[in-house]
Amino acid sequence: PTARAEALWPEVRAALAQLRAAFDPGEFQPQLEPASFRLTMSDAISTTLMPQMVSQIESIGAQTNLRVVPPATLNPRAMLERDEVDVAVGHFPDTVASIGVEGRAATLRHRRLYDSQYVCVMRRGHPLAGRALTLDAYCEAHHLLVSFSGSPFGLVDETLGALGRTRRIVLTVNQYYTAGRVVARSDLLTVLPAFFVEATGRRADLVEQPLPFELAGIHVEMIWHLRHDRTSAHRWLRERLVEAAAAALGEVPAAGPEDV
């Protein structure tokens, strides 16, 4: 395609989406209407939500298929803009902040599914497991970082830098399951959202400790493009994700029908 065609495609795609929405037959009937959706989320979030999603689909005999792919970056905007995925689920603070700044002109929408706090995770029997974790002890230890990009610098390192401290990242991995297995069999420390520890599959082998510094909480959001905002099938999908989070975690933050 020419550069001109590529430049026009987002506008054409948006117009087509509006046309589809205009002819949307109304309430989606999952038992009668085959549908496939692509979602992007980490393995930890998938472990939390997908068992509940599959249970919902199977229990009502829905002709619905889900395709889950890993996030390429910490900002899913490009995947959503290019219509590569229908929904992104994860902790995307920069994306959510930009949606707020854009206001009515925003092309993305979001809704919070659940909240969590970060904890320091180590193997059971680790020398630091039996006592309060100090900042000095934390910084002197060796660390594992879950990094989708492979960069050995994350939110914790930014926070430590503000305190004039650093840590050594011995290993970066891109899966929480892998992180749990490595930490359970080494003296490495890692920092995970508390809800994600279960996704490592090694909870019985791990110990959680409060962090020796302040770290903002994690907010797991689902984000979708405006083109799918009012399509009945996509609304049905998002409602199922909200229910899956409620069933898996026991609580969904109070909010309007689809937030902002």
Regions found by a protein language model. Give the residues of each.
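Central regulatory/effector-binding core of bacterial HTH transcription factors
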Residues: 34-97, 173
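Hydrophobic residues within well-ordered alpha-helices
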Residues: 2-5, 39, 79-81, 138, ...
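Secondary-structure junction motif
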Residues: 91-94, 122, 128-135, 139-163, ...
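Flexible hinge/capping segments at coil-to-helix
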Residues: 30-31, 102-143, 228
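A late-sequence structural motif
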Residues: 49, 130, 135, 196, ...
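Beta-alpha-beta core module
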Residues: 97-99, 103-111, 115-116, 177-226
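Alpha-helical "hinge/linker" immediately C-terminal to small N-terminal DNA-binding modules
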Residues: 1-28
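Hydrophobic hinge/microswitch elements
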Residues: 72-85, 91, 148-207
